[in-house]
Every structure is written in C-alpha cells, then in structure tokens.
UniProtKB/Swiss-Prot annotation:
Residue ranges constituting the Cytochrome c domain according to the UniProt record: 69-222
Gene, per the UniProt record: CYT1
GO biological process: mitochondrial electron transport, ubiquinol to cytochrome c
Name under which the protein is recorded: Cytochrome b-c1 complex catalytic subunit, mitochondrial
One Pfam family this sequence matches: Cytochrom_C1
Cofactor(s) annotated in UniProt: heme c
Highest classification ranks of the organism: Eukaryota, Fungi, Dikarya, Ascomycota, Saccharomycotina
Sequence similarity: Belongs to the cytochrome c family.
Source superkingdom: Eukaryota
Gene disruption phenotype: Leads to lethality, showing that it is an essential gene.
GO molecular function: electron transfer activity; heme binding; metal ion binding; ubiquinol-cytochrome-c reductase activity
Predominant location category: mitochondrion
Induction cue: Expression is induced in high iron conditions. Expression is repressed in alkaline conditions and during spider biofilm formation. Expression is also repressed by HAP43.
Disulfide links within the chain: none
Length: 288
C-alpha cells in the first residue's frame, strides 16, 4: 500500500514539474516574440514611411462637397508641374466641364493638343485637334520612354493615386511638403534618390517639385508650397472619385425619402393596427 502511495506521489510531482517547465517555456517564448515585435514596430516608420497626420479636408464631412475653386487651382498645378512626368489616363477633358472649367475653357485646352486621327485615303496617319471626348494625354509614349527619362524610375499614373495610397490626400500633401533640406545623419541614399520620410524606405526618385510662387493662380490666391500641395491633393482626390459630389447628393435625397417612408409606415401601421390591438371582446356565457 505504501509503495502504491509513494508511486502515485512521484507521478504527481513529475506531472507538476512538466507542467511548470511548459509554463516557463511558454512565458519565455512569449517574451522573446514580444521583444521581436517591438523591434519590428520600431522599424516600421523607416520601412513603410512615416504615417501622415490627419488633415481637416473640407470634403470629408458627411454632407460636404469638394472645394471646386481648389480643384481648378489643383488642375493648374498638375498641368504646369506634375504633367511633366505623370499621366492622368482616366480623366477626359469633358470631366472638367461643370467641375472646374466651363465648356469653352475645356474645349480650348483640348484643341491646343493634337491627337491621332483616322488615316487618309492613302493610309497615311493624320493629326486632329483635341475634343472634349479625348482623354488628357500623358507625357511619354510608353513605360520604357518614361523610365529612360527618369533614370529607371517609372512615374505612376495619378488618376487613382489617392485611392492607391494609405492615407489618401493626407499622404499626398505630406509627401509634397515633407522634403527636408538635408537627410538625417546616418541616412545613405542611392544615387539619384531624394529623402522623404513619408515615402516607404525614405528614398524617392522624385525630388521636391513645389516651391513658393512656382505658379501664378488666376484668382490671385498666394501660391505658397502648402497651398499648391493642398490644391493638387484636392484635385487628385476628385480625379480618383469624380462621382463624389453626386453620390453625396443622391445619398441625402435617399435619406430624406427613406426617412419619410419610414415615418409613413409607422403611421400606417398604427392606423391599421390600433383598432385591432385595442379591440376588446366580451364573453357572455350561454344561459342555462
């Protein structure tokens, strides 16, 4: 009997020892994984770019629309600065009508450019002035020409750039205004690169492009670096979502109509069911 009790006690001690060892091992592994994750998080800002601050854009409100004067100024910045390297393939001249320009203004800008036309009777290619239906042309014929002109870097199309980047307009504004005079100490950049903390990795082929008074706004707005960055960010946000204003207008209309129908349904329900729910029955037992 004593032998059996001693054997049982030894088995219990072994089980407790194994359980304690497993617990210590698990805690140690968890601590090491936590330290490794902290190291990875510390590298995130350098590897993935500094997170841009959240700016109070006027069009971010639930019932707010774009600042169309800012869209017009932003298109001017794009046309005079950004269009030298970046395309806007998804935007046609007609998209500007009623948003930032009149029909005659958009048509005049389109006619300044030449587009490929149908060949003549002899099969030779012809050129024609642009029309409102034409899309805004890019600066390069193809990707190879773009890379050759930019030391191997390929300038992205800006039609959907706001939707394609985490942070949207905040990222675009921060990137355009985030170039320091000198890179931080210890940062080594590849040849032909520039330092920008908001760009993943910090090394970006595009140098600073916005400087005070670089463009002359038609409405007399001071063309500071931050103002130009704000306007072109607003324009690119509109370019990535041209239906933004109409969507909010239709959403407001739908909200009003559905709310009215909901209130009407409550009234109908009460009108139809109140007599039924308040109906009382009287039971008269049969007389014997």
């Amino acid at each position: 009997m004593f032998r059996t009790a001693y054997k049982t006690m030894n088995q219990s001690m072994v089980q407790k020892f194994i359980a304690g060892g497993v617990g210590v091992t698990g805690l140690t592994a968890s601590y090491l994984l936590y330290q490794d994750s902290m190291t990875a998080d510390a590298m995130t800002a350098a590897e993935h770019g500094l997170h841009p601050p959240a700016y109070n854009w006027p069009h971010n409100g639930m019932f707010e629309t774009f600042d169309h004067a800012s869209i017009r100024r932003g298109f001017q910045v794009y046309r005079e600065v950004c269009a030298a390297c970046h395309s806007l393939d998804r935007i046609a001249w007609r998209n500007l009508v009623g948003v930032s320009h009149t029909t005659s203004e958009a048509k005049a800008m389109a006619e300044e450019l030449e587009y490929d036309d149908e060949p003549d009777d002899e099969g030779k290619p012809r050129k024609r002035p642009g029309k409102l239906a034409d899309y805004i042309p890019g600066p390069y014929e193809n990707e190879q020409a773009a890379r050759a002109a930019n030391q191997g870097a390929y300038p992205p199309d800006l039609s959907l750039i706001v939707k394609a980047r985490h942070g949207g307009s905040d990222y675009i504004f921060s990137l355009l205004t985030g170039y320091p005079d000198e890179p931080p100490a210890g940062v080594v950049l590849p040849e032909g690169s520039n330092y920008n903390p908001y760009f993943p990795g910090g090394a970006i082929a595009m140098g600073r492009v916005l400087f005070d008074d670089l463009v002359e706004y038609e409405d007399g707005t001071p063309a500071t670096t931050s103002q130009m960055a704000k306007d072109v960010s607003t324009f690119l946000n509109w370019a990535s979502e041209p239906e933004h204003d109409d969507r909010k207008k239709w959403g407001l209309k739908a909200l009003v109509v559905l709310s009215s129908l909901y209130l009407l349904s409550i009234w109908v329900k009460r009108f139809k069911w109140t007599p039924i729910k308040n109906r009382k029955f009287r039971f008269d037992p049969p007389k014997k």
